[in-house]
Each structure stands twice: as structure tokens, then as C-alpha cells.
Amino acid sequence: DVISLNVPDVVKVYGIFESTNTNDAACPSINMGSMDGPNSNTSDLIIGERFVGQSSGAVGIYLTRNSDISIGFVYLNNSIFEPEEIVKFKDSNVTAIVTLVNSGSPNITNDFKFKTGQNSAFYGISNITRKADIDPPSRRLKVYYARGTYDTNDTGDITTVNSYGG
């Protein structure tokens, strides 16, 4: 029922995906061409940035760099990216043409509740809990999330109770 994410400071779960076979689960992905950034590949993009399909209106958030031409993402609306459409990345300002759209594994995010691990007495590990009326997953899961981190080489950070919103 409860799956630990094994880390604190998770602020958002972007997606939970269940594999359809014995392989690892995967988020949706797109292949792109004609990227107009300095390196003309996905190294010009910023993980976590939003991007929009100019004809479909689909909005995604970039999660993983799969290769020089492919990224993994999650949809932020109900529209779907289309082959041959132009996508515009908001932070890097890169545009590209979608050449292939892969739907990825089934997104079962709505089958779970997310808990940050924060409570009034202590700050614990983040987790997801399966909703009571949902059958347990039978295949591998992959959870994509955003979390706060600190650079261990940075000697200037101080964290207090006011550092966390809640």
C-alpha cells in the first residue's frame, strides 16, 4: 500500500508509470530534429523546463535526456504532441521539430496519493500510497519526482523551519 521514495524533500510527483511487461517502465518520449540551440541537440535543453507543441497545444515537462535527439517527459495537459509539429522550450528558448512520439508506459499517477513526509514533529521520507479501491500494480513502476537538494560543497546554506512551505 505504501511505497517509500527513499528520499526526503520531494516537492512534486510528476508521474508514476507501470510497465506492461518485464522491462522497466518509462515516461512518454519524443524524438526531435532541427533543434536550433547552440549544440543542435538535447544537451541545449534544461531538465525541468516546460515545452509546448505549436499546433497541438500539448504541454510537457522535460524529465530525462535519452539521447542527442530524444527526451522523456510528462504531459501537463490532455493534448498530445504530433509528429512534424514545432515544439518550443520555455527556459532554453530552443525550438525543434518532433519526428517521433512514444506514449511510454501506462501512467497510473492517479492511483496513488503523495506524501512529502513533513509533519509537525519531524521531517521524514517521502512516499506514495495506493488508493484503497485500486488493485496493486503487478509490474515494475517508475516514479518521476522533483526534490530539493543541497550542494555539499556549498558552505553557505542554512536551513530553518521557515525554509519549508507547507
Regions picked out by a protein language model, each given a short descriptive name:
Residues 89-92, 99-101:
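Glycine-anchored, exposed beta-strand/edge motif detector
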Residues 56, 92-93:
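Short, surface-exposed secondary-structure boundary micro-motifs
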Residues 81-82, 88, 94:
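Polyanion-binding and phosphate-handling cores
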Residues 1-39, 44-49, 54, 67-83, ...:
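Signature of Asx- and small-polar-rich beta-strand/turn repeats characteristic
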